[in-house]
UniProtKB/Swiss-Prot annotation:
Residues 639-1640 are annotated as: Proximal segment. Residues 24-67 are annotated as: WD40-like repeat 1. Residues 108-149 are annotated as: WD40-like repeat 3. Residues 1551-1640 are annotated as: Trimerization. The gene is CLTCL1. The lineage of its organism: Eukaryota, Metazoa, Chordata, Craniata, Vertebrata. Residues 258-301 are annotated as: WD40-like repeat 6. This is Clathrin heavy chain 2. Residues 68-107 are annotated as: WD40-like repeat 2. The modification N-acetylalanine is found at A2. Signal peptide: none annotated. Residues 524-634 are annotated as: Distal segment. The modification Phosphothreonine is found at T394. One of its GO terms (cellular component) is extracellular exosome.
Length: 1640
């Protein structure tokens, strides 16, 4: 059998798997305040970060770059507390905002969240609580006890109400860990030191106690062993039994002698204590008895942090390895474990009762039976009540208690049992029935109500039936709770709560007999019946048949209610409801035509009998509605021709509902009836529906009546949108026939849809007086030739000129071509060309004329164009062609003219004269074309000359390709002719490079020999000689010595170097020797030929320094030092001075070194040489020579020498040297020592060193040389870190004016910084306040505003203070300052701008009082600005109390759009006082939120009738009909009185008004009132009044209508009665009694 475990273990995840470094898993870096978050401080590289692990999503840790010494997460939300030093901050991570911050006076060594909004802070001396609420600061709770001195604080706990506080610490003493705790009572403000390691508080309710007790549990490990203590802290609550202290041993295994408790948590649900030790052991204890339930090791590593695990009421923790573990009670096993393994049945029972756990059923049954048998009924009842899962709360148990008779003077055992059950919780169904039966028998219904409210009873249908006999409303509550729909609805009906029936039935899904219910409701209240009927049909699927509901209304003659119901019921317009729709419309057309008209107008219904309704509409005078319903064309045509009786807009829309044929028939009928009257309307219809009716049919319709005007207007409305060519053609024809030539022009110009050929033919046939439309069409569609022919043949040459001059000059070439085709006179054509001033293509004109071989025709015009300065290539091209064809000096023209297109003219000349083609191509650099012409015509000489002159490498590469068959002929001409003729070196150079690029060395030698050796101009050309020799070295080495000997003007050094690299050493030596480059020659002898003897002989023979130097260097390399030095001296060569100086320095021979360096300086002037020479002179004490030397030109490092002299104390020499090298900083320091201040300042400026400036500045200040000090200071203040020291130096000595002058002068500096502007502003506030505002206005953005704010406030500079507050966005303070000091700080624009930005709205209201006091005339401007932020009700009240409402009338108007009651009433009051009745009427119509009746009562007494009319209007709007009618009667507004009486639906009021008209003799009003109040007047009363006043004739129309209605009603009632009699044979009527069980 598997082992039974009372606890369950779970590993949630491992921190290392989430990327957490094991080094960061520890007490100092990881915190866990609850089971929601784990927070770890990490350091990745140099970057500190905080990692937050959400336990609900641990695989997605949140990492934030936060540097903090400690971080703890809020136990409930994503709020983190951070500590850095003494600074504490709380941030909301989700909102990304800082919530609170505080700086402690002492270091916080431990802190912890003790609730969701409180952090406990522990310092070395005290404990504080810091609440997140409001702006509260940490509050000190208690001072730390001396027993915790030197302890490491590891925990802090509080009870649930934070009345008991506990601080836990540990320390190492005598080779063991000692725990120290301090328990503090908040109420008693006393502490108690306790030895302990881990502790927790618990709220535990013992059996028999009314309230839970606060228990304090703590564990300790001392030298004698471990103990767990459980005690109650504080006084027990009233009526509670005190908790008996428990102290039990805590077992530590022998192998864990150094183990001790580290954590404790309470499992509140199960009443257990979880105790964790350092070695990872879990101890589980019963909280009430202290019994140890189990002990087990759950972790091999220390669990250093724990928290309650709320989902399981267990404990969760983290160990050193990074495992996140939780432990909880195993509910399925723990009772069995306690009973069977621990052999502790009492513990099992307590656990089962406490947590309602299974496993102890037999124990409970046995105990219950034992107690019951002993007569301990109360105890047995408690056992039954507390038994888990309700195992004893059965009918048998109730019967057992019922069987026991009650003792005299005592409650029966059954009632005792029920009482205990009620104390424990809710009764079940059986218990509830039995108890209620007993209570109701005793007449104690109030107990039943109390238990129901407390939810102590399980409601059922049986319970409701039981209660209903006593209280139906109480039974309704029971039925609702028991979910018995039939009984609930029955109770609703019996109690008159009809509207709740539908809602409840829908909610619970129950379906009663709705018609039966409705008929009963209707008899009780028609209005409630209407509402009930609406609820029955408000869903998509009605709950009852609508026809049956309508029958119920008609049975009771409720026409108005029936109409209202049907409008709601039929709103979905279903086809199946057609008959109902017909009934509704017929009913209202007979009784209320205006209602029917409204219904039809809204087009709510579409499925009624339209033919029947159409007839009724016609009879009711609704002609428009009748026309909409007619379907027969004869009826429609008969009605539609009466257009003067119909709304034109409606009629146009009506045609949209007709078929195409019917629409055309109706239009035909309308035009036939009265074309003058109906033409415009027909055009509108045709325009709107032309797509449906067909444009062609409509055109034929208008043409059949010869109405071109109508056709023009119709087509004009659609032509801009139509793509039909016929439409555009017909429109053009109609426009022509109606004389609309301008419109013809427009459509011809803009339209792209007509057939141009047809339009052109029509316009030609139309013979219009203005040919412009024809011109436009021909121009647009390329009929220019036809146009010219037409115009020319019809003698309309004037329009040809108009066309080319005004319409489209660009068509001139085509026009000229056409004129040439009709053999027009050349003079006319020339004149026409000359007359055109617009832009046209010369190319096209030339092409047109050239096609016809009439090019010379253009000569005069072309020459005139050129004389006018025309530079167009086409013009010059044409002229060139004419000159070429006429042989009129064409070559001269081609060479001199700069504007023709060379490619065009060259191509023109190719077949005529290739030479001219070359001229043209050469002029335009048409390379490929020229080469092609030359090759085709064997013009190689011209081609060679062109290539040489062209100097284009790419072109050369093209012609020198191997694929060029003419390359050899071309090269011959280049060599023989082109290069011989040229005098341009660049041409030669490009040509040679081209041959080199083409890799033609033999041809290149041939070319170069021709140039260089044949005594040409370029024979002495250096580069060409170089190239010839180099080419020979590359291609033919046998010629090299010959060329070297014959030529004299080549680069010897380069040639010799190339010869060396090509192993031609003798040739190289010959070149060097020939050109006297003996040093190079001896180098060849030494390095390449390798003969030193020959080299020495050569040096003796030459006796040149360079030669000796070469020889000396070689000797030095052979260690011949003495000989080498002699050679250097003979060669006068200091080049190896480094080696010489090093050797001389080692021998310390300064005199010889001076001689060598002097020689070397004469030759080399090297810096090192001169530096060493200066130092050598200094060392040899030759000061005068030193001064002469440094004053003369030199390249020495004088600074180094000066430093060496300065270090050795030679200051005069150093001064000379520093002066020479301009080391002004060191020189200034030297001069300060010598007392030369002026020179020191000058040199400081040159040095530009802050340290030097400070030193000189302070020295000048001490000497009161303020001018020099300011000069120095300007270079110091630009360094922010130096400014404070400089200012202190000035101010300590009282030089304030000088300091201000210094800072003012410094503001213009390029490096001016914020500190300068800030400090100057502060100085102004102290010593020159009049200049401060100007300074701030200029430089506010560059000052430290908080610092200047403090200074301005201290100096009472209010205007400046406001300015700064505004710029710093502290608008509240700015407004307060302006209101506190208005004479100095208030400015209107500034105030209005700032007041809108304040955060405290209260300031807006204070501003209103401020303006009333100081600026009342500007109050409206302020109100308009503040309007979005003001409470308008408060504002109106404020000005009303101040008696200033008229002053703010503009404001009231501006905010009335908010429809605020106070604003409306205040403005209405003002308008009344001003007698502005129009404004008042507009106000009350637009804004209805005011006391209508109060205003009406005021206005009815007004002396102006207009205001009394408004009063009547208000009474009417508020259903005060009698007052409204009386006012109308008084002011003789009889029509209004009748309308108000009719709208009131008050028959008595209408009757009184009718009688009043008779009393006043208003016969016409009597008749009008009969019509207006028709449905409110009783016919018998009207008949009597008419007869008595002899007005029967006036009343006759009324009686006729009444008779008609009564006859209709009688007919309908007769039909209904017949139907009812038929139904009576089917079923007998049932009384209004509801059972709802499916039976009546």
């Amino acid at each position: 059998m598997a082992q039974i475990l009372p606890v369950r273990f779970q590993e949630h995840f491992q921190l290392q798997n989430l990327g957490i470094n094991p080094a960061n898993i520890g007490f100092s870096t990881l915190t866990m305040e609850s089971d929601k978050f784990i927070c770890i401080r990490e350091k990745v590289g140099e970057q500190a970060q905080v990692t937050i692990i959400d336990m609900s999503d641990p695989m997605a840790p949140i990492r934030r770059p936060i540097s903090a010494e400690s971080a703890i997460m809020n136990p409930a939300s994503k709020v983190i507390a951070l500590k850095a030093g003494k600074t504490l901050q709380i941030f909301n991570i989700e909102m990304k905002s800082k919530m609170k911050a505080h700086t402690m006076a002492e270091e916080v060594i431990f802190w912890k969240w003790v609730s969701v909004n409180t952090v406990a802070l522990v310092t070395e001396t005290a404990v504080y609580h810091w609440s997140m609420e409001g702006d509260s600061q940490p509050m000190k709770m208690f001072d730390r006890h001396t027993s915790l001195v030197g302890c490491q604080v590891i925990h802090y706990r509080t009870d649930e109400y934070q009345k008991w506080l506990l601080l836990v610490g540990i320390s190492a003493q005598q080779n063991r860990v000692v725990g120290a705790m301090q328990l503090y009572s908040v109420d008693r403000k006393v502490s108690q030191p306790i030895e302990g390691h881990a502790a927790a508080f618990a709220e535990f309710k013992m059996e028999g106690n009314a309230k839970p007790a606060t228990l304090f549990c703590f564990a300790v490990r001392n030298p004698t062993g471990g103990k767990l203590h459980i005690i109650e802290v504080g006084q027990p609550a009233a009526g509670n039994q005190p908790f008996v202290k428990k102290a039990v041993d805590v077992f530590f295994p022998p192998e864990a002698q150094n183990d001790f408790p580290v954590a404790m948590q309470i499992g509140a649900k199960h009443g257990v204590i979880y105790l964790i030790t350092k070695y990872g052991y879990l101890h589980l204890y019963d909280l009430e008895s202290g019994v140890c339930i189990c002990m087990n090791r759950i972790s091999a590593d220390t669990i250093f942090v724990t928290a309650p695990h709320k989902p399981t009421s267990g404990i969760i923790g983290v160990n050193k390895k990074g495992q996140v573990l939780s432990v909880c009670v195993e509910e399925d096993n723990i009772v069995n474990y306690a009973t069977n393994v621990l052999q502790n049945p009492d513990l099992g029972l307590r656990l089962a009762v406490r947590s309602n756990l299974a496993g102890a059923e037999k124990l409970f049954v046995r105990k219950f039976n034992t107690l019951f048998a002993q007569g301990s009924y109360a105890e047995a009842a408690k056992v039954a009540a507390s038994a888990p899962k309700g195992i004893l709360r059965t009918r048998e148990t109730v019967q057992k208690f019922q069987s026991i008779p009650a003792q005299s003077g005592q409650a029966s055992p059954l009632l005792q049992y029920f009482g205990i059950l009620l104390d424990q919780g809710q009764l079940n169904k059986l218990e509830s029935l039995e108890l209620c039966h007993l209570v109701l028998q005793q007449g104690r219904k109030q107990l039943l109500e109390k238990w129901l409210k407390e939810d102590k009873l399980e409601c059922s249908e049986e319970l409701g039936d039981l209660v209903k006999t006593t209280d139906p409303m109480l039974a309704l509550s029971v039925y609702l709770r028991a979910n018995v729909p039939s009984k609930v609805i029955q109770c609703f009906a019996e109690t008159g709560q009809f509207q709740k029936i539908v809602l409840y039935a829908k909610k619970v899904g129950y379906t009663p007999d709705w018609i039966f219910l409705l008929r009963g409701v209707m008899k009780i209240s028609p209005e409630q019946g209407l509402q009930f009927s609406r609820m029955l049909v408000q869903d998509e699927e009605p709950l009852a048949n609508i026809s049956q509901i309508v029958d119920i209304f008609m049975e009771n003659s409720l026409i108005q209610q029936c109409t209202s119901f049907l409008l709601d019921a039929l709103k979905n317009n279903r086809p199946a409801e057609g008959l109902l729709q017909t009934w509704l419309l017929e009913m209202n057309l007979v009784h209320a035509p205006q209602v029917a008209d409204a219904i039809l107008g809204n087009k709510m219904f579409t499925h009624y009998d339209r033919a029947h309704i159409a007839q009724l509409c016609e009879k009711a005078g609704l002609l428009q509605q009748a026309l909409e319903h007619y379907t027969d064309l004869y009826d429609i045509k008969r009605a539609v021709v009466h257009t003067h009786l119909l709304n034109p807009e409606w009629l146009v829309n009506f045609f949209g509902s007709l078929s195409v044929e019917d629409s055309v028939e109706c239009l035909h009928a309308m035009l036939s009836a009265n074309i003058r009257q109906n033409l415009q309307l027909c055009v509108q219809v045709a325009s709107k529906y032309h797509e449906q009716l067909g444009t062609q049919a409509l055109v034929e319709l208008f043409e059949s009546f010869k109405s071109y005007k109508g056709l023009f207007y119709f087509l004009g409305s659609i032509v801009n949108f139509s793509q039909d060519p016929d439409v555009h053609l017909k429109y053009i024809q109609a426009a022509c026939k109606t004389g609309q030539i301008k419109e013809v022009e427009r459509i011809c110009r803009e339209s792209s849809c007509y057939n141009p050929e047809r339009v052109k033919n029509f316009l030609k046939e139309a013979k219009l007086t203005d040919q412009l439309p024809l011109i436009i069409v021909c121009d647009r569609f390329g009929f220019v030739h036809d146009l010219v022919l037409y115009l020319y043949r019809n003698n309309l040459q004037r329009y040809i000129e108009i066309y080319v001059q005004k319409v489209n000059p660009s068509r001139t070439p085509a026009v000229i071509g056409g004129l040439l085709d009709v053999d027009c006179s050349e003079e006319v054509i020339k004149h026409l060309i000359m007359a055109v001033r617009g832009q046209f293509s010369t190319d096209e004109l030339v092409a047109e004329v050239e096609k016809r071989n009439r090019l010379k025709l253009l000569l005069p015009w072309l020459e005139s164009q050129i004389q006018e300065g025309c530079e167009e290539p086409a013009t010059h091209n044409a002229l060139a062609k004419i000159y070429i064809d006429s042989n009129n000096s064409p070559e001269c023209f081609l060479r001199e003219n700069a504007y023709y297109d060379s490619s065009v003219v060259g191509r023109y000349c190719e077949k005529r004269d290739p030479h001219l083609a070359c001229v043209a191509y050469e002029r335009g650099q048409c390379d490929l074309e020229l080469i092609k012409v030359c090759n085709e015509n064997s013009l190689f000489k011209s081609e060679a000359r062109y290539l040489v002159c062209r100097k284009d490498p790419e072109l050369w590469a093209h012609v020198l390709e191997e694929t060029n068959p003419s390359r050899r002929q071309l090269i011959d001409q280049v060599v023989q002719t082109a290069l011989s003729e040229t005098r341009d070196p660049e041409e030669i150079s490009v040509t040679v490079k081209a041959f080199m690029t083409a890799d033609l060395p033999n041809e290149l030698i041939e070319l170069l020999e021709k140039i260089v050796l044949d005594n040409s101009v370029f024979s002495e050309h250096r580069n060409l000689q170089n190239l010839l020799i180099l080419t020979a070295i590359k291609a033919d080495r046998t010629r090299v010595m010959e060329y070297i000997s014959r030529l004299d003007n080549y680069d010897a050094l380069d040639i010799a170097s190339i010869a060396v690299s090509s192993a031609l050493y003798e040739e190289a030596f010959t070149v060097f020797h020939k050109f006297d480059m003996n040093a190079s020659a001896i180098q060849v002898l030494i390095e390449h030929i390798g003969n030193l003897d020959r080299a020495y002989e050569f040096a003796e023979r030459c006796n040149e320094p360079a030669v000796w130097s070469q020889l000396a260097q070689a000797q030095l390399q052979k260690d011949l030092v003495k000989e080498a030095i002699n050679s250097y001296i003979r060669g006068d060569d200091p080049s190896s001075y480094l080696e010489v100086v090093q050797s001389a320095s080692r021998s310390n021979n300064w005199e010889d070194l001076v001689k060598f360096l002097q020689m070397a300086r004469k030759k080399g002037r090297e810096s090192y040489i001169e530096t060493e020479l200066i130092f050598a002179l200094a060392k040899t004490s030759r000061v005068s020579e030193l001064e002469d030397f440094i004053n003369g030109p030199n390249n020495a490092h004088i600074q180094q020498v000066g430093d060496r002299c300065y270090e050795e104390g030679m200051y005069e020499a150093a001064k000379l040297l520093y002066s020479n090298v301009s080391n002004f900083a060191r020189l200034a320091s030297t001069l300060v020592h010598l007392g030369e201040y002026q020179a020191a300042v000058d040199n400081s400026r040159k040095a530009s060193s802050t340290r030097t400036w400070k030193e000189v500045c302070f020295a000048c200040m001490d000497g009161q040389e303020f001018r020099f000090a300011q000069l120095c200071g300007l270079h110091i203040v630009i360094h922010a870190d130096e400014l404070e020291e400089l200012m202190c130096y000035y101010q300590d000595r009282g030089y304030f004016e000088e300091l201000i002058l210094l800072l003012e002068a410094a503001l213009g500096l390029e490096r001016a910084h914020m500190g300068m502007f800030t400090e100057l502003a502060i100085l102004y506030s102290k010593f020159k306040p009049q200049k401060m505002l100007e300074h701030l206005e200029l430089f506010w953005s560059r000052v430290n505003i908080p610092k200047v704010l403090r200074a301005a406030e201290q100096a009472h500079l209010w205007a400046e203070l406001v300015f700064l507050y505004d710029k710093y966005e502290e608008y509240d303070n700015a407004v307060l300052t302006m209101m506190s000091h208005p004479t100095e700080a208030w400015k209107e624009g500034q105030f209005k701008d700032i007041i809108t930005k304040v955060a405290n709205v209260e300031l807006c209201y204070r501003a209103l009082q401020f303006y009333l006091d100081y600026k009342p005339l500007l109050i409206n401007d302020l109100l308009l600005v503040l309007s979005p932020r003001l409470d308008h009700t408060w504002t109106v009240s404020f000005f009303s109390k101040a008696g200033q409402l008229p002053l703010v009338k503009p404001y009231l108007r501006s905010v009335q759009s908010h429809n605020n009651k106070s604003v409306n009433e205040a403005l209405n009051h003002l308008l009344t006082e001003e007698e502005d009745y129009q404004g008042l009427r507009a106000s009350i119509d637009a804004y209805d939120n005011f006391d209508n009746i109060s205003l009406a009562q005021q206005l009815e007494k007004h002396q102006l009738m207009e205001f009394r009319c408004i009063a009547a209007y208000l009474y009417k709007g508020n259903n005060w009909w009698a007052q409204s009618v009386e006012l109308c009667k008084k002011d003789h507004l009889y029509k209004d009185a009748m309308q108000h009486a009719a709208e009131s639906r008050d028959a008595e009021l209408a009757q009184k008004l009718l009688q009043w008209f008779l009393e006043e003799g208003k016969r016409e009003c009597f008749a009008a009132c009969l019509f207006t109040c028709y449905d409110l007047l009783r016919p018998d009363m009207v008949l009597e009044l008419a007869w008595r006043h002899n007005l029967v004739d006036l009343a006759m129309p009324y009686f006729i209508q009444v008779m008609r209605e009564y006859l209709s009603k009688v007919d309908k009632l007769d039909a209904l009665e017949s139907l009812r009699k038929q139904e009576e044979h089917v079923t007998e009527p049932a009384p209004l009694v509801f059972d709802f069980d499916g039976h009546e």
